[in-house]
């Protein structure tokens, strides 16, 4: 089934620093909020991608937050990139702001792109991770495993432990 894209789309980039266990619940909260909002207003989450710090490092991610200077590597622990789309521009703007607010409650910072060019820049890092994944086994587990969203923090911490143990 092919669906027509709604008339108005905004892209959010949400950066989270610190512990994954503190940040990951925002994925579930945003998903739940957006599914309810789609039923209420027709505004939908047209895509949501999670990038962890390994991917961010691999693609040379340019952190948008000013907080990066005090975070050791300068990279967020996790980034979410998502498209929020609908037929009513005001509804899309309001709901996008609410998604940023939800991220703020979990220590995240949100950045919003409105123009097609700015939106494309937000998605460019995700596109680069896909290219890297095609040419290396470094991220193979992400392609082969479906992780229940509420357990994403456990997965992230577990992979980090394995990376440290196996890097000896």
Language-model features and meaning:
Residues 1-168:
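Noncatalytic alpha-helical scaffold of FAD-dependent oxidoreductases
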């Amino acid at each position: 089934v092919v669906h027509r894209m709604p008339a108005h789309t905004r892209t959010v980039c949400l950066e989270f620093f610190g512990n994954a266990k503190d940040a990951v619940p925002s994925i579930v909260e945003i998903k739940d909020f957006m599914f309810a909002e789609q039923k209420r207003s027709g505004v939908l989450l047209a895509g949501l991608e999670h990038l962890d710090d390994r991917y961010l490092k691999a693609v040379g991610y340019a952190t948008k937050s000013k907080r990066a200077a005090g975070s050791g590597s300068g990279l967020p622990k996790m980034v979410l990139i998502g498209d929020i789309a609908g037929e009513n521009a005001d509804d899309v703007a309001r709901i996008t702001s609410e998604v940023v607010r939800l991220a703020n409650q979990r220590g995240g910072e949100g950045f919003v792109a409105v123009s097609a060019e700015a939106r494309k820049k937000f998605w460019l890092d995700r596109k680069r991770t896909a290219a890297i994944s095609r040419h290396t086994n470094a991220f193979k587990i992400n392609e082969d495993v479906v992780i229940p969203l509420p357990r994403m923090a456990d997965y992230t911490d577990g992979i980090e432990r394995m990376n440290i143990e196996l890097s000896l």
